[in-house]
């Protein structure tokens, strides 16, 4: 039994193809709608699975080709994040057999596939499959790493992407002097479609590592949003996914920043001395930005692709507090009022300061001087 799956996002097609092949189906995939139509004519599948929203042509155009041009009754299943009633109605009027809204589970896709075309003769009915979720959007996550050989929680990362499709992790090795690069390359093995290792031979600091990673991931056409996250997972991937959900469901937001604001039910821990210094630094930051940010320094942020160049196009002045520079660049480019509408600060459910963090208390004091650098540099930029 042959299945053709058409979706412009490769991160959606990869787990879908893998699951259907595991079930015993013969599967071909295509990211371009026009080429998908050509493949339909040559492959002659028993089932077509297609997304509606694609850049070249709509998935409904694929349906029209099958039903109106080829006059074929080939079963068609639509997988889409589009919930527009008129679009769904048009799909069924054209003759689609099933419609599933993303996010959805591969288990359900498999069950509906069997209902539409039956099970392959070679299908192992006793086999149990993991319940991977196909997301509506595709997200790139940049994770800067410097000497993380002992601390990197490799299993936490792999477990998450194995269960949640639509994520592409980009680990940036920032000139580590230990075996971090070897650890990252081992992590990547077998998951090359979901994990990238970007190697910087020389240590340039976290700011430059994140910047290089963000610009690299911005070139990936199938990603909707791109963010960054600390390697120690002081903010975990589940909390990061909440930030993604916020930016996905609010068109006005271009940046959603995690915030370590202590609140009821949240697991937020900091050393008391570190907390006092953080409060002092935050007061200075609010004055520089003219914005009431509670926490700019949390290492968990998600961005719309259309603000990546403004935020990361130029090298940062400072090594650690580049987050402040990002927000300052946004306010200078869009204006303060517009920037306030674009930026969202979202409290985290969990944030724990991990042992072995590279930032010492002495370093924290140095940050005050770097804030002075930022204020001076971007005041000059504003005058130009």
Model-derived features: where do they sit?
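A conserved acidic beta->alpha catalytic loop
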Residues: 173-182, 233
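C-terminal output helix
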Residues: 86, 104-113
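Alpha4 helix (beta4-alpha4-beta5 surface) of REC/receiver domains from two-component response regulators
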Residues: 61, 83-98
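Acidic catalytic/metal-coordinating carboxylates
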Residues: 32-35, 58-62
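Short hydrophobic/Thr-rich beta-strand motif most characteristic of the beta2 strand and flanking loop
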Residues: 24-31, 39
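Acceptor/aglycone-binding surface of glycosyltransferases and processive sugar-polymer synthases
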Residues: 198-216, 225, 237-316, 320, ...
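Active-site beta3 strand of CheY-like receiver
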Residues: 43-49, 54
């Amino acid at each position: 039994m042959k299945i053709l799956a058409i979706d412009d996002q490769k991160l959606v097609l990869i787990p879908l193809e893998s699951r259907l092949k595991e079930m015993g189906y013969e599967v071909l995939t295509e990211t371009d709608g026009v080429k998908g139509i050509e493949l339909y004519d040559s492959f002659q599948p028993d089932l077509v699975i297609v997304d509606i929203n694609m850049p070249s042509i709509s998935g409904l155009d694929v349906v029209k080709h099958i039903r109106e041009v080829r006059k074929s009754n080939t079963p068609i299943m639509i997988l889409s994040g589009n919930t527009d009633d008129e679009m769904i109605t048009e799909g069924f009027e054209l003759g689609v057999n099933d419609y599933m809204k993303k996010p959805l589970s591969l288990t359900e896709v498999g069950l509906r596939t069997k209902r539409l075309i039956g099970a392959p003769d070679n299908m192992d009915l006793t086999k149990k499959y993991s319940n991977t979720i196909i997301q509506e959007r595709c997200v790139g996550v940049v994770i800067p790493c410097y000497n993380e050989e002992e601390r990197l929680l490799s299993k936490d990362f792999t477990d998450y992407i194995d269960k949640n499709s639509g994520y592409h992790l980009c680990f940036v090795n920032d000139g580590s002097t230990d075996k971090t690069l070897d650890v990252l390359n081992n992590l990547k093995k077998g998951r090359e479609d979901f994990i990238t290792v970007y190697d910087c031979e020389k240590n340039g600091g976290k700011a430059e590592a994140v910047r290089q990673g963000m610009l690299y991931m911005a070139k990936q056409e199938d990603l909707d949003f791109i963010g960054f996250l600390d390697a120690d997972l002081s903010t975990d991937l589940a909390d990061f996914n909440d930030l993604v959900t916020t930016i996905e469901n609010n068109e006005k937001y271009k940046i959603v920043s995690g915030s370590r604001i202590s609140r009821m039910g949240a697991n937020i821990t900091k050393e008391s001395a570190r907390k006092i210094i953080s409060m002092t630094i935050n007061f200075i930051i609010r004055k520089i930005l003219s914005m009431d940010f509670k926490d700019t320094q949390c290492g968990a942020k998600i961005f719309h692709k259309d603000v990546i160049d403004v935020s990361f196009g130029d090298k940062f002045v400072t090594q650690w507090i580049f987050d402040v520079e990002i927000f300052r660049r946004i306010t200078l480019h869009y204006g303060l009022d517009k920037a306030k509408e674009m930026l969202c600060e979202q409290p985290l459910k969990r944030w724990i300061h991990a042992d072995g963090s590279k930032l010492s208390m002495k370093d924290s004091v140095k940050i005050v001087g770097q804030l002075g650098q930022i204020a001076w540099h971007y005041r000059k930029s504003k005058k130009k």
